[in-house]
Regions:
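Short amphipathic alpha-helix that is part of the acyltransferase structural core
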Residues: 1-24, 119-155, 266-275
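Acyl-donor-binding surface of acyltransferase catalytic domains
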Residues: 58-126, 235, 242, 254-265
Length: 275
């Protein structure tokens, strides 16, 4: 695969724009940052039909896209083995094609949900309690997310804090919080934004406040934000319980996706030993 250049960028964005639900982060990062972000790198591969595979590395993890099959993966696998990303995300079919060839990774699958733009046309309960967070709040936000059993395994507090600050500074994302008793009790964020859409993520409530309605207040708040700004709202879900709840809440499955997470070194060695 060849390194993407500034000259490649317009046609790559046009290529991705045709299938946005299956390449949301890849498109948003390239649209906002171009190729100037020091924490990013991007590659592409072409064939007789034109652009085929696009790969992007952001803070170490990979996002992949291609609108054709991934049977020929030699150059991509070479890139993955060279860069050793801790995580790889792509549409489901791509992850299914790569997983058997990457035994040091564990596969997980989920769906991309899109919410109706008119869902949250009216103010929701608790809006007066919600504040947009600033960089001074980032360490506490990162600690709260990393303490969550599901979300926390994807990040380290320091690495997540760096990403959150970068999103705030560049306009790629915003965080919103509810404070109680001098601390952040709940948080939601837009983890990526561009003119067409936003991706909501990082919705977490401190264990001491799980009996509150904060989860629903923040979920409604970010839906209102998307509606006011005329953007589609997307979210990614792997938990079947959350999926059932969200499907009842006027969200449609827009795409299926998968992710590969690199196994800890001990797990990899045990598997190689034939256990």
């Amino acid at each position: 695969m060849k390194r993407m250049t500034r000259e490649d960028l317009p046609r790559v964005l046009d290529y991705l724009r045709k299938d946005l639900p299956r390449c949301l982060y890849l498109y948003a990062d390239l649209w906002v940052y171009g190729l100037d972000n020091p924490h990013m790198a991007a590659w592409l591969q072409e064939d007789g039909a034109g652009l085929g595979k696009v790969a992007m590395e952001y803070h170490g993890s990979f996002q992949l896209y291609g609108d054709r099959d991934f049977e020929e993966t030699g150059e991509l696998l070479e890139l993955i083995r060279r860069r050793q990303p801790p995580g790889i995300s792509a549409r489901r079919e791509i992850i299914e094609a790569l997983a058997p060839r990457l035994p040091d990774y564990t596969a997980e699958y989920g769906v991309v949900l899109r919410r109706d733009r008119d869902y949250a046309s009216q103010p929701g309960e608790g809006e007066a309690e919600i504040r947009q967070a600033g960089e001074e709040d980032v360490p506490e936000i990162a600690a709260l997310i990393c303490a969550d059993p599901e979300m926390g395994e994807q990040y380290t507090p320091g690495g997540l804090a760096e990403q959150l600050r970068e999103r705030m500074r560049t306009g790629m994302g915003r965080s919103f919080v509810i404070r109680r008793d001098g601390r952040i009790a709940a948080h939601v964020a837009t983890f990526a934004e561009c003119p067409e859409f936003l991706i909501s993520s990082g919705l977490v409530v401190h264990p001491d406040y799980r009996d509150s309605l904060y989860f629903y207040w923040l979920d409604h708040w970010v839906a209102r934000l998307a509606a006011r700004e005329g953007k589609d709202q997307y979210g990614m879900v792997t938990d079947p319980r959350l999926l059932r709840a969200f499907r009842r809440d006027r969200r449609q499955v827009a795409a299926e996706y998968g992710k590969l997470s690199r196994k800890p070194p001990e797990a990899g060695r045990e598997n190689q030993g034939g256990n």
